[in-house]
Amino acid sequence: MSYSKIPAGKDLPNDIYVAIEIPANHAPIKYEIDKDTDCLFVDRFMATPMFYPANYGFIPNTLADDGDPLDVLVVTPYPVAPGSVIRARPVGVLHMTDEAGGDAKLIAVPHDKLSVLYKDVKEYTDLPALLLEQIKHFFENYKDLEKGKWVKVEGWGNADAARAEITKAVAAFQK
């Protein structure tokens, strides 16, 4: 599969495609899809034994502030297989900075055509408060045992802020 051939979405910035690298609740292994080969590589075994609280991946054909495609967490009822592409709707963004600079994490839910379970979720605040705390806690702590790495969570942004991140990342990729 060539992820470069997958558009960023069907109706940007409201309807996006996300290439999943790490399924929700998976073992603490950081996978990354290599942009040159389109292969799923083991990036590292995470030193801090934590699992991603939602499916983790990126929007193809985008470029975020950290020089990588825009990161997305997709909340689903079940873990999604690594390498899969899922159609989703952005509902928020977790603003963060790490040792490499700005590192926003979009929060999304499956498009209504995939599941009606999230049809009433329009903003990240419509998700369970505990899940939001788990996401924040994960990113505040998942690099704790890795020397030279750190994360500072700066706060949440709404669906409009998430859509603005998408628009900016698509424009940056097209430059």
Curated annotation (Swiss-Prot):
Positions with a binding annotation for Mg(2+) 2: D71
SUPFAM superfamilies for the chain: Inorganic pyrophosphatase
GO molecular function, one term: magnesium ion binding
The name this protein goes by in its record: Inorganic pyrophosphatase
Pfam family, one: Pyrophosphatase
Gene name for this UniProt entry: ppa
Naturally occurring in which organism (per UniProt): Pseudomonas aeruginosa (strain ATCC 15692 / DSM 22644 / CIP 104116 / JCM 14847 / LMG 12228 / 1C / PRS 101 / PAO1)
InterPro entries found in the cross-reference section: Pyrophosphatase, Pyrophosphatase_sf
Assembly description: Homohexamer.
Keywords, ordered alphabetically: Cytoplasm, Hydrolase, Magnesium, Metal-binding
Record-level GO cellular component terms: cytosol; extracellular space
